[in-house]
Curated annotation (Swiss-Prot):
Reactions catalysed according to its record: Endonucleolytic cleavage at apurinic or apyrimidinic sites to products with a 5'-phosphate
GO process annotations (BP): DNA repair
Protein's name according to its UniProt entry: Endonuclease V
Record site feature (Interaction with target DNA), residues: Y70
Intracellular or extracellular location(s): Cytoplasm
Gene: nfi
CDD domains for this protein: Endonuclease_V
Lineage, uppermost ranks: Archaea, Thermoproteota, Thermoprotei, Sulfolobales, Sulfolobaceae
Amino acid sequence: MEDYIIDFLIKFQKLIAKNVKIQHLGIENVKRICGTDIAYKGNIGYAVAVKEEEGKIEYNLVKGDVFFPYIPTFLFVREAPLMIKAVEKYECDLILVDGHGLTHPRKSGIATVIGVLLDKPTIGVAKSRLTGDLVVENNITYVILHGEKLGVKVGKYFFSIGNKTDLSDVIDLAKKGYPKVLKLADKLSKDLKKKE
């Protein structure tokens, strides 16, 4: 990848990070929760958004070409366009994104990028740690980056602030385990990929 493209993407991520709003949402107030994930077959991406409202499940599948290679810390370029297209169909009080939020070297993981671009509350839920130190306090494993608590690890999952949420929201969500809407989005995206 050309240096000037990487430089441009870093500038974009820094701008996203400057526009993050950390504010309390209140998980108990969330009536419409959405989750988004993506699977790949070659250069084709299969993104799914799952919405749950009062026990009713809806989902939207979006398929498209993926033009950008996988480069760690720049996942958003590859995945966010299709994820946004999938999730934009729904009005969501909270969007859960398969990936990191502020627990990213430039505080600009895919959950943060999607949250800022859509001006929506987001939380990132990732299956591996990208950056930050793990510190246990009062039986909670925090992910700390530059002295700031930005997420938590529960089981094998890493939950982090995306946008328009705060650490207490992240903790409250994480206590419920791996979110159902993300489980479904993961399954549906993989099922769609297999059918093609």
